[in-house]
Amino acid sequence: MIKGVQITESTNKNLLNSFWLLDEEKNEARCLVAKGDFQEDQIVAISELGQVSYREVPVNVAPTIKVEGGQHLNVNVLRRETLEDAVKNPEKYPQLTIRVSGYAVRFNSLTPEQQRDVITRTFTESL
């Protein structure tokens, strides 16, 4: 079981008022916030904290995924011809929604210049 603690007494002054997650089953402590010697998310053996007194603090531990060095993939499920037809016949595509800079927008609400720009940027002949 993981418990959250705030260190209230320690021979190491950098540990005073620091917050940790203690996993006694694994004998590990994860730093949440501390001064000086320890970094955020650093995992150390509980024994490395030395002689400390602490008070328990309520912790809501939810599993999280930490991704570093990931990649972004933009998937388009439209064909170029569909967007070109939407430019010529907007009445056929009143609900056509696209993503522009992370925002969802109705394709027909864009200006003709913006529509051409979306088509040009979205569909390229080569990489």
Swiss-Prot record:
Disulfide cysteine pairs (residue numbers): none
Glycine radical modified-residue sites: 102
Presence of the UniProt keyword Translocase in the record: no
One cellular component (GO) term of this entry: cytosol
PROSITE patterns: GLY_RADICAL_1 (PS00850), GLY_RADICAL_2 (PS51149)
Role noted for this protein: Acts as a radical domain for damaged PFL and possibly other radical proteins.
Protein name per Swiss-Prot or TrEMBL: Autonomous glycyl radical cofactor
Native source organism of the sequence: Glaesserella parasuis serovar 5 (strain SH0165) (Haemophilus parasuis)
Chain's gene name: grcA
